[in-house]
Amino acid sequence: VNIGSDEIKDIVCGGINLEEGMRVAVSCPGAVVRWHGEGEPVVIKNSKLRGVESFGMICASDEIGLGELFPSETEGEILDLSAFDVPAGTSLANALDMNDVLLEIDNKSMTNRPDLWGHYGIAREIAALYNLPLAKIEPFRADVQSDFKVEIEDPDRCTRYIGVEMSGVAVKPAPYKMQNRIWKVGMRPINALVDITNYVMLATGNPTHAFDADNITDHIVVRHAGEGEKLLLLNDKELELNADDLVITDSEGAVALAGVMGGAKDLILPKTERVILEVANFEATGIRR
């Protein structure tokens, strides 16, 4: 294995997908990893494996804390970094653009400032305080024709609901730059459609969601839940709702808990070809509760 400056090291590896010329993550002696992503962290040492001296470890993604960003398709799969065109020996943090400084802001200190609940709002505040230029988000208007309808039964709890129907979509991974940014702030990349909604939510602080339109019956209604009404969420948790809960429904029942989480009925799947993108303004107190 070339680990930089044309330094070649013998490393014993049993990865099922390993092949010549593949770019991989190597932990050299002294590095700390989690063996197969489980148990206590271990320190890598020079060792003899299968009668061969091994000078490090070729890593799977979950062994170095990257399992959510680079999920393995099968057990025993090595992290394939061939898509990253960097010289051998480049630190993984530099190769994967992970040398960011993360600022953690406790939102309990600004619950009265919904304009600061997204990254752009924080940037705008900093620009105002320090008289700095602020990058502008250019508006975009699409000429979309659709028979899709939305009804809001409680305009006090939902002041605005925008739904855009799109067809002919293909469910693919989001660009790495978007996946990386989402992962850095504690969210798991899923696919381009879901990641886009989460990315926009993080940027603007505004709830967004994507529905599989083929699983929405008739039209969307924003209403209060019925007492004892059931909703199966996309994390497979079933909720028993009460009349204070605000839900997104179709003609058959609740499909999402407004501003919180979507339901299992209409989640985005690899076969999804038609979607409804939701952007809404929900009353904050109810969402927080």
What does each model-found stretch correspond to?
Residues 1-140, 276:
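Phosphate-backbone binding interfaces of nucleic-acid-interacting proteins
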Residues 1-12, 197-265:
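Conserved mixed alpha/beta core segments that line enzyme active sites in large multi-domain catalysts
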Residues 9-10, 23-25, 55-57, 102-103, ...:
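Structural motif
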Residues 15-23, 111-131, 186-210, 252-272:
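Conserved phosphate/anionic-ligand binding catalytic regions in large, soluble enzymes, centered on
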Residues 16-19, 50-51, 94-98, 127, ...:
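Solvent-exposed alpha-helices and their adjacent loops that cap or buttress functional pockets
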Residues 35-42, 69-72, 116-120, 145-148, ...:
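Short acidic, glycine/serine/threonine-rich loops at helix termini
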Residues 62-63, 71, 80-83, 171-172, ...:
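Conserved catalytic alpha/beta cores of large enzymes that bind or transform nucleotide phosphates
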Residues 130, 134-229:
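Glycine/proline-enriched, intrinsically flexible loops and inter-domain linkers
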